[in-house]
Structure formats: C-alpha cells, structure tokens
Design a protein with these regions (language model features):
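N-terminal flexible/basic segments that precede or flank functional cores
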Residues: 1-44
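Short coil/turn segments at secondary-structure boundaries
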Residues: 27, 60-61
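Short basic helix-loop element that most often maps to the first helix and adjoining turn
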Residues: 42-58
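Juxtamembrane/interface motifs at transmembrane-helix termini
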Residues: 43-45, 61-62, 89-91
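Recognition helix of helix-turn-helix/homeodomain-like DNA-binding domains
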Residues: 63-80
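DNA major-groove recognition helix of helix-turn-helix/homeodomain DNA-binding modules
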Residues: 81-91
C-alpha cells in the first residue's frame, strides 16, 4: 500500500529538523542492507536522500548521473555492494 503524500512530507520535515532522527534513519537503512533486506534498505536510503541532500547533490558528490542513482535505489534496482557503500559514504 503506497504511503500518503502527507505522511512522506511529515517524515521529510522531521528529517530536515531533527539531526538525531536523520542519523537513526540512515543507520536503519544500512542495518536493513546488512541484514539482507535490500528492498527496505533501498527504500529507506531513497527517503533519506530525498529529504536531505537530494539526488542531484549526491550525483555531484559521487560523479554518477542522478538518474543512475535513482534507478539503483528503485524497487527494481539491483545495485552492487560497492556502489551502495559509495552512496552511503557520501551521505
């Protein structure tokens, strides 16, 4: 079931305002990836990126096209571990 727009906006607002919440959400995304829950980990990282630096800034930092980064973290994306670690490094 897709989340309502209001919920996503609420989470994004909290991420922008609360440093501890940002840190914990990023940690949760990484823990999901390490536990093998790739779908949840990618979704959490996507939300984190959208609410913080955005894909354009991540693209600048990683020197990878923003569309490639979005595709990598999409539900059908199948990123290599080194690419995920590179993204996490720049967050």
């Amino acid at each position: 079931m897709p989340l309502t727009r209001e919920f996503k906006e609420t989470v994004q607002a909290r991420l922008r305002a609360d440093r501890k919440y940002r840190k914990e959400l990023l940690r949760e995304g990484v823990e999901c990836l390490l536990a093998g829950d790739l779908d949840t980990g990618k979704a959490v990282l996507r939300d984190y990126i959208n609410a913080t630096i955005g894909f354009e800034e991540l693209s600048r930092r990683t020197k990878r096209p923003a569309k490639s980064l979005m595709r990598m973290l999409s539900p059908s994306g199948n990123p290599q571990a080194r690419n995920l670690f590179e993204v996490i490094h720049h967050l």
